């Protein structure tokens, strides 16, 4: 009897369910749930998606109509200005859509929803960034598809299967790189006013300092230098090369700049390198902010 009293009795509740199963969501499930939330936001308020389609479409129609009677050989050989412009507007559409990708996350910060996510028992806080990046990349690609379709009705010839793969790769690289930078800005800047101001300041200068609206040799020397440093110029010229060449290859010269000739393969390597640099920069910023 004494030995039984000396024994320690451990009381345990009888559970009818396993608590660990409630919080055992994988990273993919978290990303899927967060993307579903963002999809519902766009479904209920599609104005942002429509604006991202209408704005570049107006550029394509109105600016293309402005130079409708321009000589065929004025900008490039045997190419109308509408065909010349469409490549620039396609890249500009992906750039603009990706640049706005930090706004939903910024509003989540200001309205307190991000704090709820950070205090939730997530498998990884990286799912917050991956879901936003994946969703905004898909939105930008949807906008690009609409602009590509519109450009076909304005005289652009459709790409073949191989050209479409390289074209899609360049669009994806531009979109992912700019999306990561925009998400980093949404954590760095104090509010949505500053982020909107940054977008307004950066958007049009990047367009006019690239080869989207005019070829490089039309520009003064100082603007040629700026356009040569603009990554959008390389993506635009690569897209333009795919549209204008049937038998394209990775080693043929695409754009001539002051320090050498750039081929299609070098453009893709450059875009990949810029994405890697952006990913490294953004990862360091997000680690500091999320932790």
UniProtKB/Swiss-Prot annotation:
GO CC term (a single one): chloroplast membrane
Q: Where in the cell is it found?
A: Plastid, Chloroplast membrane
Membrane-protein topology: Multi-pass membrane protein
> Which UniProt key words apply to this protein?
Chloroplast, Membrane, Plastid, Transmembrane, Transmembrane helix, Transport
Where mainly found? plastid
Keyword Transmembrane helix, does the record have it?
yes
Ranges for domain ABC transmembrane type-2 come to 47-289
> Which GO molecular function annotations are given, in alphabetical order?
ABC-type transporter activity
- Give the stretches traversing the membrane: 47-67, 87-107, 135-155, 165-185, 195-215, 262-282
Q: Which InterPro entries match?
A: ABC2_TM, ABC2_TM_bact-type, ABC_2_transport, T7SS_ABC-Transporter
Q: Which family does it belong to?
A: Belongs to the ABC-2 integral membrane protein family.
The protein's name is Putative transport permease ycf38
Protein's gene = ycf38
